[in-house]
Amino acid sequence: MNKELEMKKEIIINRIIDFSFVLGVVLVLFPHFSKDYIPSFLFPFFGSDKVLSIYPFFVFSLFSLLLLFLKKEYKKLLFIMLACLVFCFGFFVIAEHGLFMIIDGVTQYDVEKLEGSRLSFFNIVSRLFDSKDLSFRLSISEGLFALYSAFNQFKEIILVALLIGFIYKERFDEAKRLFFIGIIISFILVILYEIIEFPFLWGSEWSLKIQETINPFFHEVYRDGSWWPPLIWQDNVLRNVFAEPSFFGYYLGFTTVAFMHLLINNKHKVLWSVFLFLSYLFAFLTNSRSGVMLVLGGTFVYCILFAIKERKINYILAILLILALAFAGNNYVVRIKEKNGIVTAYSPIEKTNTVVSPLDGNVFEVLKASFEPDDIVDSSIVRTIKTVFSLNARSNTTRYGCTFAELSIGLNNPLLGVGELYIGGYMEPALAEAGFSNGELDVWIQSQKQNGVLNNSFASFNAFTSTFADGGVLGFILDYGLLFSIIVAYIILFFRRDGFRGYKISIMLFSMIAIIIAWGFSNSLQESYLYVIVLGLALSDLLSRGRLLKHDETKV
């Protein structure tokens, strides 16, 4: 009787876990959701976080921990506790070290510039230790805030990834199925939004009005008094429900790899071909350098690994054909926009009063022109990719300037860095030493002077150099130790004779991890919760593989 009751409990808990997992995958579409529509009572524990996936994965984490406890998996629970302690203590040391390096220059003016939870911690500490000097009170409050921030980061990233790995180790096939369900549902939502957004590329007024109405739900428009994210992206490109086109491109990098896997390994190949085509087309129409590069890079990695391990060229040719059709479709859309006189980031045409429908009589001429060699050589996509390597193109001066400055700061403080909260005070001399300067950087420098040494007014464009500058080698290991351990495990697996053969899901996950690494060189990895989900699935893949090998099985 007790066993039956325990089994029923486990079944119910697993269903809650699975539902939370699928919902979390679907909600990766909303990494900057407006906090006006999130219950305020959640803010103290979640820090008013606008990444919607965090909330279902919090439920996932609670019930996963409960399941491990009921199954008496005490070693795993102890491992999680020790990992949390090491993670939090490590970032506490980094924060205290960073504050110690600048404490002599901190004034009351700097303290008055503190905001949010940092200010709350300082006020509480000041009441408890009102007789102590400023340096003492600040060191206590900043240390407490570092522990608070580190714990939140651990429970939202490391804990979720570990629990996905542990919980789905025994039923990895179910994890794969749930992941694809979540991706498919999210992509259907993307398509539904594109029914509204796509006509805007041809100057549709009704499309504009609908977007103006619904976009404030998806992200906080003009957040904190800045221009970003705007209500409507003025470059006449796709961004869907995301705050900017590059974030949409990041998401599409994952969907292209997922749909390649489904096309090759599942039925309904026409459906997956259409979804793959749309993923490519949407990515091209974002006109995002990083988005296009991620989609093409993910395709390249997947096709190379598949060709080496599976030796089935026909599928690769099918994928390349779909890619070529999407490329032509992009050029067709661009030509229609040019005929409409719509000014875009890559189409400097003067505005006219003539609106051309994509279904006009000249559709075949336009489509034919989309395949012309001259058009391909000088297409918007090629021009977009070229700007990645130009120092003066778009935001590259700012991007490369901050990246080289962070690298310099990290090399000068290699062990513990300078502290995430205090790096702003080091940026101006580092930028000057690297020889980077422009109007945007000058604005941040002036803002840094106004906000004081306890704040950081500079944006980060490279997750790895930023982490290295903030926390040195220790911070890098704490943040990315799990990620690079999984990469090493997959590489070792790849070079085994039977490596990925039969493990096609490993090819997909490794390709997604390659996308994550590439994205990290231009943005924060946390811009999409797919980072955490893919880490967890990869860990589950590796753990389940080890379990199966013990039983002399060879397939996942």
Model-assigned labels for residue ranges:
Residues 19-27, 270-278, 314-318, 454-462, ...:
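Loop-to-helix entry and N-terminal half of a specific, functionally important transmembrane alpha helix
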Residues 154-163, 177-235, 239-309, 513, ...:
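Alpha-helical transmembrane segments of multi-pass inner-membrane proteins
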Residues 50-58, 108-167, 178-181:
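Aromatic-anchored transmembrane helix interface
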Residues 35, 50, 96-97, 148-152, ...:
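Helix-loop-helix junctions and helix-breaking kinks within/between transmembrane helices
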Residues 23, 60-65, 299-300, 314-317, ...:
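Transmembrane alpha-helices of multi-pass inner-membrane enzymes
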Residues 389-412, 416-474:
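Long extracytoplasmic/lumenal interhelical loops at the membrane interface
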Residues 97, 198-201, 306-391, 408-412:
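A membrane-periplasm/extracellular boundary helix in multi-pass inner-membrane enzymes
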Residues 2-107, 530-537, 542:
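N-terminal signal-anchor transmembrane segment
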